[in-house]
């Protein structure tokens, strides 16, 4: 049976960076793509079915995109492989390598980057606009990326301080009956913001910034924030 092949010749340490630790990325590609993948030395060859017009083009686009990601200095892992295949096989118009190369901030020896097209659009919107509303399911990075953008702005001296805030009262809720000060009452609502901040800074650094007021918290109200974020 005739087959169609496409061969990529890689240079330097590109091959191990593409295949991942213990070839984890390669195994994931073999599961997600219908083309056969053969690796020999510095060459990676795709073998596709000529009767399936979408087989080889998708595989070729995925490998090309992952190589672009590697060449931009991004550490490609299995989730990135999965998202690359998903984006290129779906309706998304975003180029995966451009998504993964969207750097938010370097913290504690690692780089926080956008992981999806939606996250890329979110961080770009925060950079361009004064107020941005992020709406979506839990666990999609809304709070974490907002905090990462705030930390980056503070480090770059684009703002003087970060103000952590949430509405003092949730929709249909009355906090008046709860014991303690207003700060005591809203503290649980700010917990995800605290957790994100502590993940991006050493505990002592986070405490120092809160003690000096570089990072402060308050309930949402009319407030002068010309040089705050």
Task: Annotate the PLM regions.
Residues 134:
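Hydrophobic anchor at the beta1->P-loop junction of P-loop NTPases
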Residues 144-209:
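Conserved P-loop
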Residues 117-125:
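Pre-Walker A adenine-sensing motif
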Residues 106-117:
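Dynamic helix-loop-helix/coil hinge segments at AAA+ ATPase domain boundaries and subdomain interfaces
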Residues 141:
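Conserved glycine(s) of the Walker
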Residues 218-225:
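Conserved small/polar residues in nucleotide/adenosyl-binding loops
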């Amino acid at each position: 049976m005739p087959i169609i092949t496409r061969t990529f010749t890689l240079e330097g340490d590109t091959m191990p960076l593409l295949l991942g630790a213990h070839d984890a990325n390669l195994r994931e590609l073999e599961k997600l793509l219908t083309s056969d993948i053969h690796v020999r030395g510095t060459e990676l060859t795709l073998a596709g079915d000529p009767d399936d017009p979408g087989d080889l083009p998708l595989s070729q686009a995925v490998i090309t995109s992952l190589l672009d990601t590697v060449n931009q200095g991004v550490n490609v892992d299995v989730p990135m492989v999965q998202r690359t295949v998903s984006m290129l096989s779906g309706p998304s118009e975003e180029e995966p390598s451009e998504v993964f190369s969207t750097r938010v901030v370097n913290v504690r020896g690692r780089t926080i980057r956008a992981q999806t097209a939606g996250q890329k659009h979110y961080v770009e919107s925060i950079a361009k606009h004064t107020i941005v509303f992020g709406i979506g399911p839990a666990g999609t990075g809304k709070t974490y990326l907002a905090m990462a953008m705030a930390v980056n702005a503070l480090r770059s001296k684009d703002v003087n301080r970060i103000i952590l805030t949430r509405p003092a009262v949730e929709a249909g809720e009355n906090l008046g009956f709860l014991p303690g000060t207003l700060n005591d009452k809203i503290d649980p609502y700010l917990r995800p913001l605290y957790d994100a901040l502590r993940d991006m800074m050493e505990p002592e650094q986070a405490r120092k910034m809160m003690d000096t007021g570089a990072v402060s918290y308050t309930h949402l109200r009319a407030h002068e924030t010309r040089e705050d974020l």
